[in-house]
Amino acid sequence: NNSHGFVPPPYPYDRLDVFKTAAAKHVGGIIDLSVGDPCDAPSSAVIAALSTSHLERGYPPSIGIEPLRSAAHTWIQRKFDIDVPLAQIAACVGSKEFVVTTPQWMKLRTPSRDTVLFPAVSYPSYAMGATLSGCRPVAVPMTATGGLDLTKISADDAKRALMIWMNSPSNPTGALDDMGAVVAWGRKHDVPVFSDECYVEFTWQGKPRTALEYGTQGVVALHSLSKRSNLAGLRVGFYAGDADIVHYLKEVRKHVGMMVPGPAQAAGVVALNDDASVKTQASVYRKRLERTAQILSKWSGRAIDL
């Protein structure tokens, strides 16, 4: 900020453009790991749903069509063996807009608090969402294993905290957080926990986990089809959890006009019901990671842990 108002900083990925020209000169061309666009094809059934939904004429419901919310509901049951009431699930326009805009809506809900806590090593949109909402972005230091070091949150920051973000598996580290500990900390300090779980299908150690395993009170989980289904271009996601928070966000987002296009929602239904393609994609990613780990280990002389 300055005396003339907010001046946006350089967009993180735009800052890499200067390096792309040099990288492109290498034999084999550039390997772009910046934004993380999926490079594999989505399911043909998903593509077919886009052109046959007949939902392009009308305005789509902001909370998501019932089949999409039901598909999210049954996916949560299949994946995590827990039941979240349908009323506590709603659509979002991919995950990024939810990450960036939610602090603004939460600030309207609880104007007495002004701080957004987020992982120190993380997706840059957590901090920017706090800034754009007029809140204080406060990075929480990481533990040696890559989770949130809750002991490093000051009493003042905890008292002022509007919300805390958790990201597990982490982007960019892949680390798994202690979800139970974060949820317990949030409840102790009356701070809603927002759990970004967009990479849960690509959990390499143990079974996929969600913060909702510890109950929905004070917890909202965020999911996206961008990576799991190679649909980053459709912008389809959903959030689920605490009844009061989800209801509030649903109502505010209706007024804002946050709507996933109807055909994209129809495609999302097909994608959420398709576990086979996701399993295949996870296998592809794991093989690529294992090969990358071999190359990096040989180059660096250090063991690389997936």
Predicted segments with their positions:
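PLP-dependent aminotransferase class I/II
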Residues: 218-221, 225-305
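PLP-dependent aminotransferase-like
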Residues: 104-167
